[in-house]
Amino acid sequence: CLGCMTFGEPDRGNHAWTLPEESSRPIIKRALEGGINFFDTANSYSDGSSEEIVGRALRDFARREDVVVATKVFHRVGDLPEGLSRAQILRSIDDSLRRLGMDYVDILQIHRWDYNTPIEETLEALNDVVKAGKARYIGASSMHASQFAQALKLQKQHGWAQFISMQDHYNLIYREEEREMLPLCYQEGVAVIRSEEHTSEL
């Protein structure tokens, strides 16, 4: 999985260290040539420009059916406020698909746990996104194991689309996820995507 937080116009968003499109495209092309076919971005990376750059590069260098594209929803982008309400999720996926230039994403991930929105509202909206064909699967990121377990239980109870992946902070130094999150994911058959924001998830 190639984390795409590094790709984005430096004058957009909060990270002036990101690579603009002309510098990002050769890296994405080389990654594809090297066999990498999973690209993970987010609606908030560089105010949406990461999705734009990744989408254009993949259209030019790969066939859609040969790549896995994941994006995320939660953080504020433009006039879209932070959160995981139904309205925010439905608008965010449409905005992401427009920026990516795609009809669907393979995985739509919730970037954080939203303490201001009932989790049932979030999960039902995600289920509707899957039913509409705008995301094939859904994933989660950056939350406590107890929260993830609660969400998985509710999805089973209501027959909603279930999370198939968890992206959490995990590396050789920070191994807290081995205590609860990784055993939970193993038990539930959930794939783990290692996230290390300071190294752009690579």
Stretches found by the model and what they are:
Residues 114-200:
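Beta/alpha (TIM)-barrel catalytic core signal, keyed to glycine-rich beta->alpha loops juxtaposed to Asp/Glu
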Residues 17-31, 82-101, 121, 148-153:
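Short, acidic/polar
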Residues 5-7, 42-44, 72-76, 110-113, ...:
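Active-site beta-loop-alpha junctions enriched in small/polar residues
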Residues 8-22, 75-90, 111-117:
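Active-site mouth loops of central-metabolism enzymes
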Residues 1-67, 103, 131:
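N-terminal binding-site loop/beta-alpha segment at the start of enzyme catalytic domains
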Residues 2, 24, 31, 39, ...:
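Conserved, mostly hydrophobic/aromatic
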Residues 52-63, 92-98, 180-189:
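Short amphipathic alpha-helices and their capping/turn segments at secondary-structure boundaries
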Residues 35, 101-104, 109, 134, ...:
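Short loop/turn motifs at secondary-structure junctions
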